[in-house]
Structures are given as structure tokens and as C-alpha cells.
């Protein structure tokens, strides 16, 4: 029987033979489970096509398929469900409908606009279901069948991908013929196929969840084991380093103590003669403290040797010292008691030094204690001597250099320029030159210079200006403006000029950069180091640079 031409590219007389139903169902499931989106970020969950024609064997499969609640896909359309794998919306499902022309629609609104634009009357937006069914809609009675089919598909992912390509090519090229004498409608066959694919999809998802949980548990166990192993190795390394360093310290301390004891053997006879009852009491207190705090017998023997002074006990302490060295290599408990031993050593030094306050203590005893414990303790006399720094002593202040004075500068006579500046006249008296800069500050020369001569006639020196009344000075400076402020500035400047030790006049009250530059150019031979900002000083400064060779200026 010839199949009708339904818009495909086949020849009109070509016959189409339908595939067996079980093979096509497998291919549909493979497409639903193995497909990944083109961008690699979406997982194709299911892909449903409407079979244009219904197989006669569909009735036999209807009893083994799970029923779903969504409508079948319209004729020629394809329904694709994708799950997002990444991003903030990972796990969300997207439903697409692909038209026979290849157009993709993601929402019911865009689909309705498309149908309205093309004038479609047979199809309605309600025929397309964009919802994803919940998990509970699948009948659990058929799980064993879908699980068996799924396990047969899982081992070979390459076979699945090949089957996907085959099914897609078949969908694009093949059109199934309409069977004659079928009792079921196309809707029931589409429902059965979609139900079986969805059932297998649910089982595949459950298996993937179980596998992911197992992998997470195994990773956690591995990380915990790695962390514990690394912590153990770190602790072992730290312990070994501490043991090695403390062994070396113990060796050095034992050797030094034995050497000091050997040097002090000849002095023991003198100590036995000079020891007094008070020293005996001190020995008893030292021995009690050693018995209470010292964990090892070697230290007790050492303190008995210090207090007794007999040669037999010295040999016993030497043997105890050797035993102590052997114990440091074998026992780790003595390493922990290192800090306690140091505290005991300081305690014994304090007791022996405090023995000097007793009435009948000898100088030999003091010498002995200072030699044996000079490494562990610092004498108090050395700390008490240097209470103040040498910098603050009077001797240091006398020897220190005083700040440079104005007399250290070499005076010179600045050459006369064609600009006729007032500084060229007053260079011989720095005070008058600086007073002129105060007058010329923010004031033109035509106004300031006549008032300046009047002021210098009335107040010819800094001593006179220092003792003047600021009201009289302000009356004189009224034509210049800011007369009160300038009068007070002149009086204070004159006082600091006489009393303050200054190097440059910018350190004085009321003198700025203009006055400082004028002083360095005209009073001191530092015109080469100055960069003036005043326009008159700039002219004079440039003139000096242009003519310094003719004027033989250094």
C-alpha cells in the first residue's frame, strides 16, 4: 500500500516499512536519557515525537506502559524536555516544542503568536503541554521492567550515542504508513510510548542519585583519612624536631656543669671551712625545693653536691649526669619537664644570692654562686646601673654640637643691579632688610618704601622696636593697611630676632618665603640655591645668573 505524501522529500510511490515497536521504544529512551544540549549545559531528559501513523502492535504494548497525564504531541511536532546542569537554576526543567519546519518554542505565548500569525485553525495553544509531570505520577508497578531496559542501555555510552544518531536520522527521513484495521487511536500509542520513556527516565535518575551519594561518601572518607594522616605526620615531625633541639641543649648544659664542677673542686676545702650555720639552713631549704619540684634524681644529686662539697658526692653527681644524658635520649617525659628545670635553676640562684644577706656569709660563697649560675641569671647590679640613657646625661649634652648660628655664614656684598631694589641698600643690616620685606608684603613699593624710611628713622634697631608700643607703630603704618596686625608682627619679630637662636629667618615670626629668599640672596651668599617666586626677586636672580661671570661671582 502506498503511503500518502505528507510534506516530506520522498518519491510518491515509495513504500515505508515500520520498525518493530520494541526497537523504536529503545531508541526513544536512548534519546531521552543520553542526550546533552548543544552548549553542554543542559541534559536532554526526554524527546517525544508524534508518530504520524500507528503500528498495529501498539495494543499489545499498552498493558506494560505507565500512563501519564499530559496530552500527546500534535502531528509532526516534537516535545523536548531539558534539565539545566549548571548555574543558579541548576536542576530546573525546560520544555521545548519544535515545529515541523524546525522552529523552537519555549513558551505558550510565543507558540500562540506563531499559530495566530500563520492562521492555524486545527491546532490550539491548549494542545501543547509545557509542564513537567511530578515524580509521583509514574505507576511504581512497572519499575522492574524499565530498570531492566535501563541497565541494558547503561554499560555502553557509545552505543547509546550511536542509537541517538540513528533515531534522529530516522525521524528526519522516515514517515510511517497508516496501518489498516487498528483498533487504537494515535493518541493512545503516543501515550504508551511517552509513558515508557518517562518511566525509564525516572529509574535512571534514581540510579544516578544513588551513585552520586556513594561517590560523595567515598570522597569524604578519603579526605578524612588524608587529613588525619597529614596531621599525624605533622605531629611526628614537630616532636622529632623538639626532641633533637632539647637533646642538644641538654648535652651542652650537662657538659658545662661538669666542667664548672671540676674547676671548683680545689675550692671546696675553703668553702667547708667558711660555711656557717646560716648556710646550713640555706642548704636545707634548697634541698627541700629540689625534692619538691625536680622530677629526676640527677638534679637532686647536683644540688647536694653544690651544698655539701665532698669529693665522693661530686663523683656521684658526675655519674648521675651521665645517666641523665642517657635518659634524655630514651625518655620523652624529661623533655616536657625542661621548663620546670629551668625554673628550678633560677629559684636556686635566687636562694643562693639571697644568702648574702645572712650575717655570716663569706665572699667565697658569693664568688662560687656567681660562677656556677652566670649563664642562667644576670646580676642585679648590671640592671640597676643603667637606669637613664646616656643621651639625657649632662655630659652628653655638653659634648653635643649646638645648632648653627648666623655668624657661621659668610657675608658678602651683592652687586648693584639696574632694578634698584630696596634690598640692595639694606643688605648690611638683616633686621632692616627683613622689616622691609614685611612692609612690601602685599603692598606696592610706591606706598611701602616711604613709610619704611619713616619707621626706620623712628625705630633704627631691633632693640628699639622690641620695646615700642604696638599702638604707636600701628599709627605709623595706617597708610599701608592691616596696620594693627603688622605692628604686632614687627614687635614680636624683633623680639625673636634678638632672643631666638635661628639659622634662617623663616624660623622667626612674620617672615615667609619672600623674606627668607631676600635674606639668602642679599645677606648670605646662597643665591645659587634659591628659587624665588616674587617677580622682582626673579628679575634680580636672573640678572645674577646672566652676569655672574662678568662680576666674578663664585
Curated annotation (Swiss-Prot):
Region of interest called Disordered, as start-end residue ranges on this chain: 1-23, 154-195, 209-252
Lineage: Eukaryota, Metazoa, Chordata, Craniata, Vertebrata
DNA repair among keywords: yes
List of catalytic residues: 534
Subcellular location as annotated: Nucleus
Residue ranges constituting the MBD domain according to the UniProt record: 63-135
Recorded superkingdom: Eukaryota
Assigned EC number: 3.2.2.-
Function as written in the Swiss-Prot or TrEMBL entry: Mismatch-specific DNA N-glycosylase involved in DNA repair. Has thymine glycosylase activity and is specific for G:T mismatches within methylated and unmethylated CpG sites. Can also remove uracil or 5-fluorouracil in G:U mismatches. Has no lyase activity. Was first identified as methyl-CpG-binding protein.
Species assigned in the record: Mus musculus (Mouse)
GO molecular function, one term: DNA binding
Signal sequence range: none
Modified residues (Phosphoserine): 296, 402
Annotated SMART domains: MBD
GO cellular component, as recorded: chromatin; cytoplasm; nucleus
SUBUNIT field: Interacts with MLH1.
Biased composition (Polar residues): 154-164
Protein name: Methyl-CpG-binding domain protein 4
Any one biological process term the GO annotation gives: mitotic G2 DNA damage checkpoint signaling
Keyword flag Ribonucleoprotein: no
Uppermost EC category: hydrolase
Protein keywords: DNA damage, DNA repair, DNA-binding, Hydrolase, Nucleus, Phosphoprotein
Residue stretches of biased makeup (Low complexity): 178-195
Amino acid at each position: 500500500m502506498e503511503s500518502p505524501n505528507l510534506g516530506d522529500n520522498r518519491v510518491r510511490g515509495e513504500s515505508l516499512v515500520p520498525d518493530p515497536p520494541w526497537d523504536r521504544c529503545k531508541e526513544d529512551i536512548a534519546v531521552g536519557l543520553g542526550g546533552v544540549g548543544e552548549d553542554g549545559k543542559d541534559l536532554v531528559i526526554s524527546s517525544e515525537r508524534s508518530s504520524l501513523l500507528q503500528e498495529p502492535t501498539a495494543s499489545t504494548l499498552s498493558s506494560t506502559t505507565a500512563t501519564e497525564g499530559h496530552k500527546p504531541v500534535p502531528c509532526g511536532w516534537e516535545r523536548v524536555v531539558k534539565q539545566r546542569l549548571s548555574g543558579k537554576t541548576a536542576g530546573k526543567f525546560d520544555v521545548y516544542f519544535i515545529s515541523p519546519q524546525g522552529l523552537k518554542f519555549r513558551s505558550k505565548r510565543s507558540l500562540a503568536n506563531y499559530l495566530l500569525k500563520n492562521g492555524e485553525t486545527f491546532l490550539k495553544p491548549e494542545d501543547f503541554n509545557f509542564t513537567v509531570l511530578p515524580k509521583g505520577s509514574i505507576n511504581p508497578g512497572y519499575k522492574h521492567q524499565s530498570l531492566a531496559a535501563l541497565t541494558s542501555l547503561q554499560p555502553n555510552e557509545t552505543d547509546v550515542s550511536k542509537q541517538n544518531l540513528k533515531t534522529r536520522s530516522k525521524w528526519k527521513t522516515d514517515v510511517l504508513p497508516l496501518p489498516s484495521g487498528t483498533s487504537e487511536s494515535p493518541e493512545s500509542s503516543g501515550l504508551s510510548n511517552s509513558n515508557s520513556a518517562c518511566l525509564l527516565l525516572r529509574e535512571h535518575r534514581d540510579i544516578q542519585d544513588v551513585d552520586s551519594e556513594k561517590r560523595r561518601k567515598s570522597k569524604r572518607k578519603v579526605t578524612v583519612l588524608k587529613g588525619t594522616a597529614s596531621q599525624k605526620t605533622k605531629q611526628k615531625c614537630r616532636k622529632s624536631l623538639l626532641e633533637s633541639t632539647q637533646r642538644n641543649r641538654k648535652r651542652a648544659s650537662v657538659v658545662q656543669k661538669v666542667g664548672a664542677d671540676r674547676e671548683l673542686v680545689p675550692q671546696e676545702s675553703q668553702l667547708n671551712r667558711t660555711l656557717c650555720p646560716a648556710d646550713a639552713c640555706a642548704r636545707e631549704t634548697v634541698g627541700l625545693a629540689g625534692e619538691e619540684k625536680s622530677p629526676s634524681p640527677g638534679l637532686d644529686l647536683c644540688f647536694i653536691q653544690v651544698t655539701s662539697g665532698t669529693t665522693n658526692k661530686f663523683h656521684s653527681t658526675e655519674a648521675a649526669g651521665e645517666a641523665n644524658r642517657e635518659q634524655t635520649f630514651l625518655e620523652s617525659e624529661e623533655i616536657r619537664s625542661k621548663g620546670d628545670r629551668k625554673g628550678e635553676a633560677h629559684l636556686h640562684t635566687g636562694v643562693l644570692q639571697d644568702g648574702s644577706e645572712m650575717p655570716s656569709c663569706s665572699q667565697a660563697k658569693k664568688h662560687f654562686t656567681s660562677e656556677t649560675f652566670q649563664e642562667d641569671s644576670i646580676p642585679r647590679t648590671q640592671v640597676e646601673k643603667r637606669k637613664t640613657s646616656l643621651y639625657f646625661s649632662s655630659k652628653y649634652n655638653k659634648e653635643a654640637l649646638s645648632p648653627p648660628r648666623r655668624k657661621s655664614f659668610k657675608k658678602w656684598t651683592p652687586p648693584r643691579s639696574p632694578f634698584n631694589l630696596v634690598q640692595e641698600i639694606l643688605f648690611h643690616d638683616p633686621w632692616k632688610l627683613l622689616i622691609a620685606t614685611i612692609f612690601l608684603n602685599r603692598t606696592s613699593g610706591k606706598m611701602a618704601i616711604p613709610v619704611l624710611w619713616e619707621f626706620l628713622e623712628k625705630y633704627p634697631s631691633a632693640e628699639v622696636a622690641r620695646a615700642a608700643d604696638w599702638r604707636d607703630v600701628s599709627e605709623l603704618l595706617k597708610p599701608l593697611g592691616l596696620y594693627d596686625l603688622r605692628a604686632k608682627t614687627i614687635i614680636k619679630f624683633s623680639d625673636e630676632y634678638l632672643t631666638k637662636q635661628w639659622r634662617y629667618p623663616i624660623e622667626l615670626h612674620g617672615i615667609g618665603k619672600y623674606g627668607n629668599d631676600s635674606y639668602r640672596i642679599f645677606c648670605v651668599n646662597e643665591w645659587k640655591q634659591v628659587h624665588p617666586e616674587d617677580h622682582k626677586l626673579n628679575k634680580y636672580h636672573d640678572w645674577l645668573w646672566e652676569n655672574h661671570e662678568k662680576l666674578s661671582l663664585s
